[in-house]
Amino acid sequence: MLGKKTSPKALPKRRGFILYQGPSMLDGAPIVVIATLSTSNVKTGDAIQTWILRDDMNPVEATKTGDDSSICGSCPHRHFNNGACYVNVGQAPNQIWKSYKRGLYEQYDHKLHADYFRSRVVRLGAYGDPAAVPFEVFHIIARLARAHTGYTHQANHKNFDKRYFTLCQVSADSPKQATKYQKQGAKTFRVAMEGDGLLPGEIECLSDSDGIQCVDCKLCDGVSQNIAIAVHGSRSSKFNTAIIARG
């Protein structure tokens, strides 16, 4: 019938896709990147989550042996360093790795699967640091998606690809660090202790101040805004201790 609108064809249901299998850009060890299409994460909202994992070992084991450096690099908050990382590696990362080993995720094919990303917000690195992944992998996905968010702790790593300044906020653990990275041209995401003020040009994370989800905010894209957030998570006291120890 003339003038009748047709709904777009629904995409076949998928759990997720393997975006990359290959060497870590940080140390050359084998890693895998998996995008999962559904989430229950209340803070981010309905974003595609990407998980950066060791290919050859369970993520729980990797955190115990220190081999998580392939995906977390020099992040001071790694569990191996008794740090303040809020990710419970035994939950989602572990389950996703097990599902991957059971063959439950398809290899991403741009011609077949691009539409799964086009109308979505993508979170680069729900676990693991995006800088462990070849820049081109996430650059393609970020350009395809409606929007993206991402964070890296690797700005000082010897193998850091500075093109990630255009995709990710640089994580900062102090006002001094934030100022340093901003002078290098990065947008920062600073974790602040309770009572800290904002630096010039910073705004408070809108999830904290206004309850806005990441899918609606979309400012943590590496180019929009410097952000600060109060330290959070069950291991936050370890962050406080580390910051106090460093002065």
PLM segments and residue spans:
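Class I S-adenosyl-L-methionine
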Residues: M1-G247
